[in-house]
Amino acid sequence: MFNFINSLKNYSQESFRAARYIGQGFIVTLNHINRSAITVQYPYEKLITSERFRGRIHFEFDKCIVCEVCVRVCPINLPVVDWNFQQDIRKKKLKNYSIDFGVCIFCGNCVEYCPTNCLSMTEEYELSVYDRHELNYDQIALGRLPFNSFQDALVTKAS
């Protein structure tokens, strides 16, 4: 008889505890109903990037002095710099400069240590392509100014 009463007592205590936990979860859910949505509808809304955002690297061909500091400070030796030494003026002449963004870790060391500021980080983060070889940008692609998506009339800013 006492065994039945103890089991009934334990059952009622566990039922009350379960109902209390369900009630607590329901209260948390009700508290979040009035909050605004965090999700951004990506193609139609874009996030405003911060001032120090590290996006695609912009390269200015005319400012580069071919010092190769960017290659030395890169943790993965990523920038490929091709140059010729011109005997008549005794200077290096830049032939080709390329960065593979499929491998780049966007650390920003190349931008930080460049003595002539020919490298800069842009706010462009949409680098998705179907073929990974298209992420190898040469000096022409790196010199292209980034497209500001907020100038598009169909895109709204997400705050």
Swiss-Prot record:
Binds 2 [4Fe-4S] clusters per subunit. It is a peripheral membrane protein. [4Fe-4S] cluster 2 binds at C74, C104, C107, C110. GO terms for molecular function: 4 iron, 4 sulfur cluster binding; iron ion binding; NADH dehydrogenase (ubiquinone) activity; quinone binding. GO terms for cellular component: chloroplast thylakoid membrane. It is an enzyme of class 7 (translocase). Keywords: 4Fe-4S, Chloroplast, Iron, Iron-sulfur, Membrane, Metal-binding, NAD, NADP, Plastid, Plastoquinone, Quinone, Repeat, Thylakoid, Translocase. It catalyses: a plastoquinone + NADH + (n+1) H(+)(in) = a plastoquinol + NAD(+) + n H(+)(out); a plastoquinone + NADPH + (n+1) H(+)(in) = a plastoquinol + NADP(+) + n H(+)(out). Its EC number is 7.1.1.-. Signal peptide: none annotated. It is found in: Plastid, Chloroplast thylakoid membrane. Residues 55-84, 95-124 form the 4Fe-4S ferredoxin-type domain. Its cofactor is [4Fe-4S] cluster. SUPFAM superfamilies: 4Fe-4S ferredoxins. The keyword Ion transport does not apply. It holds the Pfam family Fer4_7. InterPro entries: 4Fe4S_Fe-S-bd, 4Fe4S_Fe_S_CS, NADH_quinone_OxRdtase_chainI, NDHI. Belongs to the complex I 23 kDa subunit family. NDH shuttles electrons from NAD(P)H:plastoquinone, via FMN and iron-sulfur (Fe-S) centers, to quinones in the photosynthetic chain and possibly in a chloroplast respiratory chain. The immediate electron acceptor for the enzyme in this species is believed to be plastoquinone. Couples the redox reaction to proton translocation, and thus conserves the redox energy in a proton gradient. NDH is composed of at least 16 different subunits, 5 of which are encoded in the nucleus. This is NAD(P)H-quinone oxidoreductase subunit I, chloroplastic. It comes from Chara vulgaris.
